[in-house]
Regions:
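Short beta-strand edge/turn micro-motifs at domain boundaries
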Residues: 27-28, 145-173
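Hydrophobic pocket/interface hotspot
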Residues: 60-63, 74-76, 83, 95, ...
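Short, low-complexity N-terminal intrinsically disordered segments enriched in polar/charged residues
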Residues: 23-73, 77, 178-179
Length: 179
């Protein structure tokens, strides 16, 4: 065996070991829902079955389609009846009513709000998303980010945690001075 062939064989062997060690498998090829926000980047835990991973990604897509459109008919297909918001802002109702109130209030301030999924990380029974929101308020551009963690069971979101860049949003809305 020539040195060149030996080197190629060893290189291929090392690549195969790395791929196996990283858990790269075909089952991470998830068919995304049409006409729903699509993640720009997605990482899926290789220990999940394709069915589990697909259900979790689809739940996230429907959830962010709700935030993107405000269509309340998505809620029953997206979250459980006893959905719980772990980072509920003061004054907002808990559960599915809280989601509706938040979206309605948001759309009063930024009627053309648009939600994009920048990154989606699917691990165990949780989905973590890095999101960007854009729109306009009184002809002024709005652009801020958020991070969500969703607990998914049987294809529906049971609870969430979220953190929005409220400083940037409030500055862009003119509620506080920009530095």
């Amino acid at each position: 065996m020539s040195m060149k062939k030996l080197f190629m064989f060893l290189s291929l062997f090392v690549v195969c070991i790395v791929l196996v060690a990283c858990g790269v498998e075909e089952k991470t090829e998830i068919h995304l829902l049409k006409e729903m926000p699509k993640p720009k980047a997605m990482t899926i835990d290789s220990s999940l079955s394709k069915k589990e991973a697909t259900e979790m990604v689809h739940a996230a897509q429907r959830f962010y389609a709700f935030w993107d459109t405000g269509k309340e008919n998505l809620i029953p297909h997206t979250v459980t009846e006893n959905f719980f918001d772990n980072t509920l802002p003061k004054g907002r109702p808990q559960g599915t009513e809280g989601l509706k109130v938040a979206a309605q209030n948001f759309r009063k301030v930024v009627p053309n709000i648009h939600c994009e999924i920048e990154d989606l990380l699917v691990v165990g029974d949780k989905v973590t998303a890095r999101l960007s929101f854009t729109g306009t308020h009184n002809d002024k551009k709005i652009n801020f980010f958020a991070i969500d963690m969703l607990h998914v069971k049987d294809g529906k979101i049971t609870e969430d945690w979220h953190l929005e860049d409220n400083l940037t949003l409030k500055q862009q809305l003119g509620l506080i001075a920009e530095e």
